[in-house]
Amino acid sequence: WKNDRNVTGKPYLGPYDNSNVNVINQHIDWAKQAGIDYFIYSWLGTNKKEHGPETKITNNFIRQTNIINYKIMPLYETPLALNQSPDNIDFDQKYWPSVTAGDQFIKDMLAFSTQAHNTDHSDHFLRINNCPRVALYLARNMLNQDKYFKKLKTELANRNQCLDFTADVTFWNSSDKPMARSKQSAEEQWAWLANNFSAVFGYNMYSN
């Protein structure tokens, strides 16, 4: 906006702060007028040391949507949250010296589940069959994830909790390869997705 407003134009609200309560409320009002039932927000996990400013904005958004009871669900920014390449999100790789990316994934999901199940005024989190819903960005590029999903399911069951996952796998590539890094057959890949996700979506619809 500052460099070339004639080309990029100017937002209706002007150059704004997306953590401003009035800005959040205005966007929700517009969404309601357009018949939009909920917002998906970017979530970078629980590492506040790495993502402090983003976490502050996210938490403010969650509080405000709670006040006016507007439905929301997180889009887990998998490569950023797990400090992995977006092309190969290997859950067995180290996140910390003694913590794998898969371990951090479990920690993040359990933290969200606790927030969505147990905190006061958490009814505005979108749910499917009473399970808070989470979208996983670039699920198609995950590697070595199965054992961590199994461990997460066990941990959630022990807490009498559940999560409903949506997978970003839809791409211009062949449907025979929904999990781009997997060596399993297409049938096995789709079976794994069906066992761990309730829906699929496409974040980016483009290809080389």
Give the positions of each predicted feature.
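Glycan-processing catalytic domains of CAZymes
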Residues: 1-208
